[in-house]
Curated annotation (Swiss-Prot):
Alphabetical UniProt keywords: Carbohydrate metabolism, Isomerase, NADP
Gene name of this polypeptide: hldD
Descriptive protein name: ADP-L-glycero-D-manno-heptose-6-epimerase
CDD domains given in the database record: ADP_GME_SDR_e (cd05248)
Pathway given in the UniProt record: Nucleotide-sugar biosynthesis; ADP-L-glycero-beta-D-manno-heptose biosynthesis; ADP-L-glycero-beta-D-manno-heptose from D-glycero-beta-D-manno-heptose 7-phosphate: step 4/4
C-alpha cells in the first residue's frame, strides 16, 4: 500500500520519509513545492516511489489516481509565524488541508497532520482544550481553525484523523528554514562563526537565558507519528512536546560542549562559559516586549493516555546528537 508525505522535502516531512525507509517502507509518494530547489537535498538519502508538486496532488488524490493509499502524513504548510499575508496563509494551511482531509475520509486513508503549539498563543496553559487556545498570529489561527473542523468531524469519521501540536522541534534536515530554524541550529552556526553564543538577557522576571521552551527532537516527533501509523484505531489532537520546559541556557551549553568535544576539549559549566565569553547575554529587544513567550511546556497527558510510553530525549541528549550530525555533514 502507498504512503503519502506532504511537505516531504521539508524539515519534519523528510525526517518522516527517512523514518519510514528505516522500517522498510519505500512505496512513498513525496509531495512538496520545490520552488526553493535546495530542499531537494533533504530527500537525497531517502527512497521514494514518486514526487509530485503540491498544486497537482490533491485533485489527483481525490480522483483515486494513487490506488490503495494507507496513510497521508500532511506536513506541508507555511510555517513562518511572521507571515502577514492572511489570504495566502488561510488558503495554504487551512483550505488545502481541508480538501486533503475530505479526500482521506472518502478513501478511508489514515490522516496524520501537523497542527502547532501556536494554537495556544497567549495562553499560559498548554492543554488540548478550547479554553486554552488563543492564537496570536494568522499562522496559529490557520492551525486552530482546522483543529476545530477536526473536532467536529471526529465523532462521525470512519478512518483515523490525528493532529500533532508540535512544540519547539529541532534536529536534522532544517537547514533550509532560515530564520525559522531551531535555536540549536542557529547556536551551532553562531558558535562556529563567532566563537560565542548570544542569548537574551533578563526580561519579565526571568534571569538571563532562563526563558524556557518545550524543546523536542525531531527523532521523537517521527517516533510519535509512526506510533499512530501503527495504531489506526487512535484518533484525536495531541500535544507533541516532551512535557518538560528547559531554558535556552541548556541549548547553548549543549551546543558549545558538543563542539568542544569535537575538538578534544573538556566540557564546561554555564558559569565557566560566561566567564570565558563563550556565552553572552544581550539586551532584550524592545520590539519583542509584550510579544514574547517566556515559558512553554506541553501537557502530554492525552498522548500518554493514547498509549505512547517512550521517553523523550532531553535537550542535552538531543542537541548533542544533532550537533554531531551537523558536524558530519559540514566536514
Amino acid at each position: 500500500m502507498t504512503i503519502i508525505v506532504t511537505g516531504a522535502a521539508g524539515f519534519i516531512g523528510s525526517n518522516i520519509v527517512k523514518g519510514l525507509n528505516e522500517r522498510g517502507e519505500t512505496n512513498i509518494i513525496a509531495v512538496d513545492n520545490l520552488t526553493r530547489a535546495e530542499k531537494f537535498n533533504n530527500l537525497v538519502d531517502c527512497e521514494i516511489a514518486d514526487y509530485l508538486d503540491k498544486t497537482d496532488f490533491v485533485a489527483r488524490f481525490a480522483r483515486g489516481d494513487f490506488g490503495n493509499v494507507r496513510a497521508v502524513f500532511h506536513e506541508g504548510a507555511c510555517s513562518d509565524t511572521m507571515e502577514t499575508d492572511g489570504r495566502y496563509m488561510m488558503e495554504n494551511n487551512y483550505r488545502y488541508t481541508l480538501a486533503l482531509l475530505e479526500a482521506c475520509l472518502e478513501q478511508g486513508a489514515q490522516f496524520l497532520y501537523a497542527s502547532s503549539a501556536a494554537t495556544y498563543g497567549a495562553s499560559t496553559m498548554f492543554r488540548e482544550d478550547r479554553d486554552y487556545e488563543k492564537p496570536l498570529n494568522v499562522y496559529g489561527y490557520s492551525k486552530f481553525l482546522f483543529d476545530q473542523v477536526v473536532r467536529r468531524r471526529l465523532p462521525s469519521a470512519h478512518s483515523q484523523i490525528v493532529g500533532f501540536r508540535y512544540f519547539n522541534v529541532y534536529g536534522p534536515r532544517e537547514f533550509h528554514k532560515g530564520r525559522m530554524a531551531s535555536v540549536a541550529f542557529h547556536h551551532f552556526n553562531q558558535f562556529r562563526a563567532e566563537g560565542t553564543v548570544k542569548l537574551f538577557g533578563e526580561y519579565n522576571g526571568y534571569a538571563p537565558g532562563t526563558q524556557s521552551r518545550d524543546f523536542v527532537s525531531v527523532e521523537d516527533v517521527v517516533k510519535v507519528n509512526l506510533y499512530f501509523l501503527d495504531h489506526p484505531e487512535k484518533s484525536g489532537i495531541f500535544n507533541l512536546g516532551t512535557g518538560r520546559s528547559q531554558p535556552f541556557n541548556d541549548i547553548a551549553v549543549s551546543v558549545v560542549n558538543a563542539l568542544r568535544e569535537s575538538e578534544g576539549k573538556p566540557a564546561l559549566s554555564l558559569d565557566e562559559m560566561v566567564q570565558e565569553g563563550l556565552v553572552e547575554y544581550v539586551k532584550f529587544p524592545d520590539a519583542l516586549r509584550g510579544k514574547y513567550q517566556c515559558f512553554t511546556q506541553s501537557d502530554v497527558s492525552r498522548l500518554r493516555g493514547a498509549g505512547y510510553s517512550d521517553q523523550f530525549l532531553t535537550v542535552q541528549e538531543g542537541v548533542s546528537r544533532y550537533c554531531k550530525w551537523l558536524l558530519e555533514r559540514s566536514a
